[in-house]
């Protein structure tokens, strides 16, 4: 018999910024790093003989909670990857909701009907994950393995193992980041002993402010973004007086939720470029939308804007400037 701990990766940028990451690589957030530390404490006294992870960064980084303290090698496997979401990759969920609402509804509630250009089918993901787990179980007979994968992939695998048809997948939860499921494999049979346990995340800071709730019926809403013409917004006087207006031609993105403007972020590509910084001269969230997780989605757009330029950090004005109110025409 083989014991397998099946573990979802820690919080990554796509989770935080509300971006469809699928098989795209993304970094672990600060909260994700704390989740990894909590996971390491959980497994400190649990014997593990082998550690496997998908070859994406977020799973490999999460797997360090186990393989590094125990001095084990990490076995990277492409067949443990998340479902490929095709043309949705690296789009915001808000943009997807605007462009393809019918398929997003299918993705959230009727995954067996979902398909977009370039994407894997859910059935293909189940076949891929089942084969991977069976191969790992056979290679570790009589041992215990930790296997790191992704939210949708794990959900599909557990449904297949529990005999839940794809038509009823919407009734099952998606485990939290670093949630653990326990499998026992003997021959061709793989039993789900328990699933989606995140009891190691005892500190509210591990989950407070998360933009994705663990629920069966879908995802929290995200923003979509459009370029904002300077004449469309009156920049806050206090901000302009301190930092000066963005240089001519500097891009400004407005974030919208269901057609309603929520906030804006501006970029100054030339400022502090020699220091590897991405300068954000303005980050503004309108009063009704503050403290609801939308400001960090604006930050996510700055990350996506500056990372291809090789910038490895962001700089913002003083904190008093970060929450200035934006007025919209």
Where are these regions (language model features)?
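A short, internal acetyl-CoA/4′-phosphopantetheine-binding micro-motif in the GNAT/acyltransferase core
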Residues: 79, 283-290, 318-320
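Conserved acetyl-CoA pyrophosphate-binding loop and the N-cap/start of the following alpha-helix
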Residues: 31, 289, 293-301
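Acetyl-CoA-dependent GNAT
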Residues: 230-282, 286, 299, 305
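Active-site-proximal alpha-helix that buttresses catalytic centers in soluble enzyme cores
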Residues: 5-72, 76
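Conserved active-site alpha-helix within GNAT-family acetyltransferase domains
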Residues: 157, 296, 308, 320-329
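Phosphate-handling substructures
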Residues: 70-128
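Conserved GNAT acetyl-CoA-binding A-motif
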Residues: 306-318
């Amino acid at each position: 018999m083989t014991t397998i701990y099946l573990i979802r990766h820690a919080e990554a940028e796509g989770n935080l910024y509300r971006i469809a990451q699928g098989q795209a690589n993304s970094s672990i957030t600060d909260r994700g790093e704390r989740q990894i530390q909590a996971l390491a404490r959980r497994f400190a006294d649990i014997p593990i003989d082998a550690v496997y992870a998908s070859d994406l960064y977020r799973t490999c980084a999460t797997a360090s909670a186990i393989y590094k303290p125990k001095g084990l090698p990490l076995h990277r496997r492409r067949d443990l990857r998340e479902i490929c979401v095709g043309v949705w990759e690296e789009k915001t969920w808000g943009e997807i909701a605007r462009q393809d609402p019918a398929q997003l509804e299918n993705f959230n509630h009727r995954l067996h009907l979902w398909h977009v250009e370039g994407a894997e089918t859910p059935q293909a993901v189940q076949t891929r994950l089942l084969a991977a787990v069976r191969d790992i179980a056979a290679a570790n007979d009589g041992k215990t393995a930790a296997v790191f994968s992704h939210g949708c992939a794990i959900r599909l695998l557990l449904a297949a193992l529990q005999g839940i048809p794809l038509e009823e997948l919407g009734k099952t939860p998606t485990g939290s980041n670093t949630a653990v499921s326990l499998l026992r494999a003997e021959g061709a049979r793989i039993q789900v002993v328990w699933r989606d346990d995140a009891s190691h995340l005892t500190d509210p800071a591990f989950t407070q402010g998360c933009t994705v709730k663990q629920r069966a019926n879908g995802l929290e809403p995200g923003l979509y973004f459009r370029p904002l013409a300077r004449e469309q917004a009156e920049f806050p006087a206090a901000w302009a007086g301190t930092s000066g207006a963005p240089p001519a031609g500097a891009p400004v993105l407005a974030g919208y939720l269901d057609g309603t403007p929520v906030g804006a972020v501006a970029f100054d590509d030339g400022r502090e470029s020699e220091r590897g910084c991405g300068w954000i001269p303005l980050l503004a969230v309108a009063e009704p939308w503050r403290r609801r997780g939308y400001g960090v989605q604006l930050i996510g757009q700055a990350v996506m804007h500056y990372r291809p330029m090789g910038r490895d950090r962001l700089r913002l004005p003083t904190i008093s400037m970060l929450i200035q109110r934006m007025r919209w025409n």
